[in-house]
Amino acid sequence: MANHKSAEKRIRQTIKRTERNRFYKTKIKNIIKAVREAVAVNDVAKAQERLKIANKELHKFVSKGILKKNTASRKVSRLNASVKKIALA
């Protein structure tokens, strides 16, 4: 284990950050999964509703500094393309 106070503090900080990161990563995955599930069953209305939520949440994470702007835009763009594809079909 740690022999210095600063090392003990770093361990505490790492644990706290790891928990926070895991929470956000899981939330992001669940948001994306919800849209993809609606697309998989060709439910256009539900997919569009969930896409709207995903767009809002992902850009909220950008403002909090959890995701980079381009990453969120890429994810939203890909989700939007998949929803648009089933909407036109």
From Swiss-Prot:
Transmembrane segments: none annotated. One of its GO terms (cellular component) is small ribosomal subunit. Keywords: Ribonucleoprotein, Ribosomal protein, RNA-binding, rRNA-binding. Belongs to the bacterial ribosomal protein bS20 family. It comes from the Bacteria. Binds directly to 16S ribosomal RNA. This is Small ribosomal subunit protein bS20. One of its GO terms (molecular function) is small ribosomal subunit rRNA binding. InterPro entries: Ribosomal_bS20, Ribosomal_bS20_sf. Pfam families: Ribosomal_S20p. PANTHER family: 30S RIBOSOMAL PROTEIN S20, SMALL RIBOSOMAL SUBUNIT PROTEIN BS20C. GO terms for biological process: translation.
